[in-house]
Amino acid sequence: MTALRNPAPTDLTPTPTVTARILVTGGAGFIGSHFVRRLLAADDVDQITVLDALTYAGHRENLGEALTDPKLEFVQGSILNAHLVDELVQQHTAVVHFAAESHVDRSFFEAGAFLRTNVLGTYTLLDAVRRFGTSRFVHVSTDEVYGPLAFGCADESAPLRPTVPYAASKAASDMVALSYHCTYGVPVCVTRSSNNYGPAQHPEKIIPLFVTRLLKGEPVTLHGRGEHVRNWLHVEDNCQGIDLVLRGGTPGEVYNIGGGTDLTSAQLTGMLLELFGAGWDRVQHIPDRTCNDLRYAMDWSKIANQLGYRPTWDLTGGLAATVDWYRRNPDRWAPHVRAGDARPMHHPV
């Protein structure tokens, strides 16, 4: 088990920006809903509006009791609806943009939907901000835009080399966002996080997929020999990083957000099996999918040194808490499994 280098300590405190009225796109999704709850707990946030299309991966239930908070307004709608976006942007002082198609396997089958939502949808938001103005536009992205690395860690200046339609659509949206800062002065910041996990993640993703299968007594499937390396980041730590960028990030800058541990998929599988007291007889090895990048790795010292970011979750405790959530909340994930939303998907050859 290897870990990214630990950033040096810093006494820097982020400089707050005006964050009184915040529009959160994709706020009923996995990461977005966790971020909304974080904002609701902040004393300096007066109003939050969630704009979410409620696709298969977004659900009002993800927001839970937050929906009853008088500071929160929920709007069902698409970021591709320019009229709606214009109306909402005018009412807010900052935008945090989570809304995206995000499942790699689905992008093999539905690349057009990924390009429309992730690129054209981001443009629609940015152009509204260009015309009406906000104090900050935080564009939430992914480490997958850097593509695979044989060695070393990608910092924010590394070239973008996406290999699959999902990552390519996010890389394109990153570039559109940064171009709006350079060309029009839109106060854009971009965050790029490593693989997120935590409570209420849709069961199409690897950790909840494996957890829900183990809970049902079904085998889990491991691509190839399980050698693919990913950095794992608890969703609450990602939200901490995004919040720091919202409040203190420098417009025009990119901030990597990582966790403390790199694991191969086989190592991750072993940790989950141990939590269930299960053996490797529960694992089926299947052929690897196309363009399954062997290794992602980021250097996230910039956000640590400049904004004081520190992950608070260790992977062992985070996985245990995540498994416990899925044990206690079968009503939140079982319907999606029955509907086929979490079915394995592979690139058609």
Predicted features and spans:
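N-terminal Rossmann-like NAD(P)+-binding domain of SDR-like oxidoreductases, especially those catalyzing
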Residues: 2-196, 265, 294, 313, ...
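C-terminal substrate-binding subdomain of Rossmann-fold SDR/epimerase-dehydratase oxidoreductases
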Residues: 2-7, 14, 42, 58, ...
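Acidic donor-diphosphate engagement hotspot in glycosyltransferases and nucleotidyltransferases
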Residues: 35, 149-150, 201, 206, ...
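Short acidic-hydrophobic sequence patches enriched in Asp/Glu that either
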Residues: 55, 202, 206, 264
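A glycine/serine/threonine-rich, flexible loop-to-helix segment
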Residues: 66, 152, 203-211
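A short, glycine- and acidic-residue-rich donor-binding loop in the catalytic cores
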Residues: 106, 205, 252
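The catalytic Tyr-centered alpha-helix of NAD(P)H-dependent dehydrogenases
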Residues: 162-169, 199, 203-207, 231-235
